[in-house]
Amino acid sequence: MRINHLFLIVAALATLSMTSCTSPMEKRTNQAIQQVMDEFQAVGVSAAVVKDGQIIYNQSFGYKDLATQTPLSNDDMMRIASISKSFTATSLMQLVEKGIISLDDDVSDLIGFQIRNPHHPDVPITLRMVLSHTASIRDKENYSTLDNLNPAVGGDCADSYYEYKPGEGYNYSNMGINLAGAILENMSGVRFDQYVQDSVIKPLGLHGGHNLDAIDTTKIACIYHRSNDQYVESNAYASVTHRLPDYVMGYSAPMFSPTGGVKISARDLATYMMMHMNYGELNGVRIISEESAKTMQTPVWMAQNSNEEQYGLCLWEFIDFIKDEKYNTPGNYLVGHTGNAYGLYSVMIWSPQDKWGIVAMTNGITHIKVKEFRQTIVNAIYKACIKE
């Protein structure tokens, strides 16, 4: 389905009903988001803002489905892409707390076959390295299978690794987090998607998950990419039911995309974010210990002059993301993650010190400015909803 961007002009009509019975803060934030939508020709945007342990703002704009002109609602879910990595790490920290695994275990012992960088065959690759993208594991064309890391299938797998010594460099690795998902499955004895559902999503009272067949698909928002100045629906969602008969426990977890497969609404993602803001606990439900939460939020890899390369365990420490000098000094950095896949752009970011956080996601924008969208919308929401 191809939709010309001029069709999106009427998306503004979907926000008219928001202008009555709203507070000054809500009106400012609605207007700020609408301006960003107009600038980026967004199909739809859903956002939520947290302050002092409460969701103080939640609104959706534009369209869930362009073909049917269905408005996007606060209940609608999108595939949030790489923010999903934090769900995988959170789940693994539960196994660490139970003493089933350690962050410094050799992942070869956790997955059941040898994981070694052939350039450094004597250097163990640890789970901490994998979760912090310092394991030297390279993304190849296909990271939806572990075959590229398995010597029994891929030989020495040399082209699946960078040449630097594991632990001494940083390269973002989707393959690495898919490996981590398989480790979760192998060491827990529970299928990856079910473990995250039962141990993180359900205890927090959230809707969504990795498995499309286990969630309410009427709440799924279409995702669009740009092609020839038109919006084209992406193949962002796929059932895996027909593949399950061939599923191998402890190996096939990438089928559910531990690296990017969570489907969730902005409101529920903000609730999940509050758990991390509160160091592992929300409303009397503890998901991980305070120590585990702080470990996830503490950078393992630190690089200068970068806004996305101070990385903990599947969480970034952001520098220069917010245009406010307060949050660009040591001790005041922001924490969170971003996502990007199929035309979806998402961000989850919070201030540990000042107890506010922002979640925003879009199901399609103009390709010309994709790198600017997340920072632009977060700054717009921050100025309208938090700073003023």
Predicted regions and their residues:
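Bacterial N-terminal signal peptides that target proteins for export
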Residues: M1-L8
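Short active-site loop at a secondary-structure junction
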Residues: V36-S46, A67-M129, Y164-M175, S257-G260, ...
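Short, gly/Ser/Thr-rich active-site loops of penicillin-recognizing serine hydrolases
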Residues: S306-E309, D320, A360-E388
